[in-house]
């Protein structure tokens, strides 16, 4: 029989249960058990009990919302940022730094099946030297929204402050908002990037329509009054420097010049410790030949070259290879060779692969380094240091080395992004 009306949806009462969280996941959710499954509860910390409303019930896990928290964990702290819980930037400001680090270390140890030997961390606040803020002009209010995206949304949280930004950049926010709001072309602004180099701040403004002469003058005056380097980006691939000098930062005492488009580590303090730890773990000797894979513009390569006989850096982004070569030249390092090669392809025929090496360092992107693991084994270096931004691909790639007879000597959790779910790490493998 034909049906000419919508069938009524079956309404089920949302079940309310009482549970206790036992773990904290990377997204700041408490993890409890219910009906033999993991139950994820935003905002609940380990050892906290709560009345929870079940909001989603899948075959392997459930989700819930806290209706009433019955006790507070001693690790619960007041979030420092007024935007926490709405802004998608941070997930764990309600948890103590100690709990954040122990939760990440436990997750890393579980994946790697090895204890975490050390935690490398820095200041938990004011650490972020780079940020991209979205811009959106609201015609109804005639105001410019400037901020970060909401979690799982394209909506912008109009931020007035951001305590994880380095203080110099956070202090710029109200002045920057006023400057951009006053532009005639405020409707055509896409986003603004802020970076604090060691020689001062820089700003990249993405605009989708040509800026008027008065707007350019306002921006240039702003850059001079706040002593920052100004770049304009009329298109995603075009960058015009309007004022200021080339930005640079120090790595192991070396000056590394970079472009605003180049990748640099967001957390300078942890980056410095990470470079020093890699050098220590590799135990670089004056006669060593060292290979640095996914080398970028030389964050590890050049410090290694100060200690080794020779260093080869391999990188898939040509602009970073060119920057690495320039930085080697400017720092009078003539024992470094850079190769522009795609490390996701067959590496055995690439020119760098014909060399022999005593030590290897690799720092791949989130996808890991499955294409190079067998060749590293073939090279048979005495030590391998793997720096990772994704523990899942690190665990996968590690299996190849472990199967070839390497052993994990040291495992460190890098707290590169406090108050977020990002987990970075580094491992020393030795034959």
From Swiss-Prot:
Entry annotation: catalytic residues: 389
Binding site for [4Fe-4S] cluster: 81, 87, 90, 162
Chemical reaction(s) catalysed: uridine(1939) in 23S rRNA + S-adenosyl-L-methionine = 5-methyluridine(1939) in 23S rRNA + S-adenosyl-L-homocysteine + H(+)
Binding site for S-adenosyl-L-methionine: 265, 294, 299, 315, 342, 363
Cysteine pairings via disulfide bonds: none
TRAM domain segment(s): 8-68
PANTHER family assigned to the protein according to its UniProt record, in alphabetical order: 23S RRNA (URACIL(1939)-C(5))-METHYLTRANSFERASE RLMD, RNA M5U METHYLTRANSFERASE
NCBIfam families: PRK13168.1, rumA
Function: Catalyzes the formation of 5-methyl-uridine at position 1939 (m5U1939) in 23S rRNA.
Family statement: Belongs to the class I-like SAM-binding methyltransferase superfamily. RNA M5U methyltransferase family. RlmD subfamily.
Name listed for the protein in its UniProt record: 23S rRNA (uracil(1939)-C(5))-methyltransferase RlmD
Organism: Enterobacter sp. (strain 638)
């Amino acid at each position: 029989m034909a049906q000419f009306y919508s069938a009524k949806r079956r309404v089920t009462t949302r079940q309310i249960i009482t549970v206790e969280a036992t773990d904290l996941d990377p997204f700041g959710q408490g993890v409890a058990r219910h009906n033999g499954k993991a139950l994820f509860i935003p905002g609940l910390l380990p050892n906290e009990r709560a009345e929870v409303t079940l909001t989603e019930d899948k075959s392997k896990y459930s989700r819930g919302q806290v209706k009433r928290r019955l006790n507070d964990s001693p690790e619960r702290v007041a979030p420092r940022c007024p935007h926490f819980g709405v802004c998608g930037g941070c997930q764990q400001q309600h948890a103590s730094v100690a709990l954040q680090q122990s939760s990440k270390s436990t997750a890393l140890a579980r994946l790697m099946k090895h204890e975490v030997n050390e935690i490398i961390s820095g200041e938990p606040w004011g650490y972020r030297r780079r940020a991209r803020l979205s811009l959106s002009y609201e015609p109804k209010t005639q105001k410019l929204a400037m901020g970060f995206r909401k979690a799982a949304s394209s909506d912008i949280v109009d931020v007035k402050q951001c305590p994880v930004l380095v203080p110099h950049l956070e202090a710029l926010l109200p002045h920057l908002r006023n400057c951009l709001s006053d532009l005639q072309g405020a409707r055509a602004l896409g986003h603004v990037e802020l970076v604090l180099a060691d020689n001062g701040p820089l700003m990249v403004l993405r605009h989708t329509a040509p800026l008027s002469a008065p707007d350019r003058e306002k921006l240039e005056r702003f850059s001079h009054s706040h002593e920052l380097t100004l770049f304009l980006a009329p298109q995603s691939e075009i960058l015009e420097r309007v004022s200021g000098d080339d930005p640079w930062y120090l790595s192991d005492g070396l000056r590394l010049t970079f472009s605003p488009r180049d990748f640099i580590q967001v957390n300078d303090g942890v980056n410095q410790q990470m470079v020093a730890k890699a050098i220590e773990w590799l135990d670089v000797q004056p006669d060593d030949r060292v290979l640095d894979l996914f080398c970028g513009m030389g964050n590890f390569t050049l410090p290694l070259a100060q200690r080794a006989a020779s260093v080869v850096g391999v990188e898939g982004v040509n602009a970073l290879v060119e920057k690495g070569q320039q930085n080697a030249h400017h720092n009078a390092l003539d024992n470094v060779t850079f190769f522009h090669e795609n490390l996701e392809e067959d590496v055995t025929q690439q020119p760098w692969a014909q060399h022999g090496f005593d030590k290897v360092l690799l720092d791949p992107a989130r996808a890991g380094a499955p294409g190079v693991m067998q060749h590293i084994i073939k090279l048979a270096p005495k030590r391998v240091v793997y720096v990772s931004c994704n523990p899942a691909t690190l665990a996968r790639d590690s299996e190849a080395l472990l199967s070839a007879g390497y052993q994990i000597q040291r495992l460190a959790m890098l707290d590169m992004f406090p108050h977020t779910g990002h987990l970075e790490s580094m491992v020393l493998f030795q034959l």
